[in-house]
């Protein structure tokens, strides 16, 4: 097996002529550039979530896929688990009648994992994921809950999301994680320990999504 290392190692990988698909499972910020490079070099791509970090990147992926005629698939694994597939099948067969409200979540206490995320050099005390949570507010990992719900509610198959409001708690656990790793006070941890998002669709249906990777509680989505 060949190994390609370094921040730009993926470019050499994508230039190979003996592979058909590039599976992307890096930190979030590298999903987009690796996917674009792969498609530019004639490879299909399968991307772990999130596939893009802003709206422009979403459109760039779409346009590149259409231009190169290469598949660009988002690997939202929660859309394909047994419970979600079974529930989707029941919804599509009318078992629940018209579904007008749905809940989804990503509630996953990451305390056993924070120390294992990739760090950018010896000076990086946080790792990429804790650093991202410190810098960004809101639901930063929405698709585990939102993906299956969107399928069940026929989003982009006759309905669309129209309005959104989100509210979060203050940061207690996140702030303490940074302080423990840096030995200094953290007064600007932006991501609340728990975020709740409400979305209303054009057809009058309501989605509730929750995000919590900080507090100790059972895994739930």
Could you describe each region identified by the protein language model?
Residues 9-17:
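Short amphipathic alpha-helix with an adjacent loop that forms part of the alpha/beta core around
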Residues 25-26, 210:
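Short, well-ordered coil/turn residues at beta-beta hairpins
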Residues 13, 22, 102:
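Receiver (REC) domain switch-region micro-motif
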Residues 68-73, 78-189:
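Predominantly a Rossmann-like dinucleotide-binding segment in NAD(P)-dependent oxidoreductases
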Residues 1:
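N-terminal Rossmann-like dinucleotide-binding module
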Residues 185-195, 199-221:
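NAD(P)-dinucleotide binding in Rossmann-like oxidoreductases
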Residues 21, 27-28, 32-80, 94:
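Beta-strand-loop-alpha-helix segment that lines the small-molecule cofactor/substrate pocket
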């Amino acid at each position: 097996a060949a190994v390609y290392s370094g921040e730009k190692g993926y470019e050499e990988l994508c230039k190979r002529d003996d592979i058909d698909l590039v599976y992307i499972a890096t930190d979030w910020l590298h999903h987009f550039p690796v996917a674009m490079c792969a498609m530019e070099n004639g490879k299909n791509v399968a991307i772990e979530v999130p596939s893009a970090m802003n709206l422009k990147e979403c459109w760039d992926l779409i346009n590149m896929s259409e231009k190169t005629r290469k598949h660009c698939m988002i690997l939202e694994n929660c859309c394909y688990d047994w419970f979600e597939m079974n529930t989707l099948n029941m919804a599509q067969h009318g078992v629940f009648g018209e579904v007008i409200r749905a809940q989804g979540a990503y509630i996953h206490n990451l305390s056993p994992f924070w120390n294992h995320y990739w760090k950018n050099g010896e000076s990086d005390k946080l790792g990429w994921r804790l650093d991202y949570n410190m810098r960004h507010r809101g639901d930063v990992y929405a698709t585990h809950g939102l993906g299956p719900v969107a399928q069940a509610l026929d989003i982009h198959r006759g309905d669309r999301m129209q309005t959104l409001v989100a509210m979060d708690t203050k940061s207690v656990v996140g702030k303490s994680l940074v302080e423990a790793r840096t030995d200094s006070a953290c007064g600007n941890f932006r991501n609340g320990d728990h975020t709740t998002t409400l979305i209303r669709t054009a057809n009058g249906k309501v989605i509730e999504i929750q995000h919590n990777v900080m507090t100790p509680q059972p895994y739930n989505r």
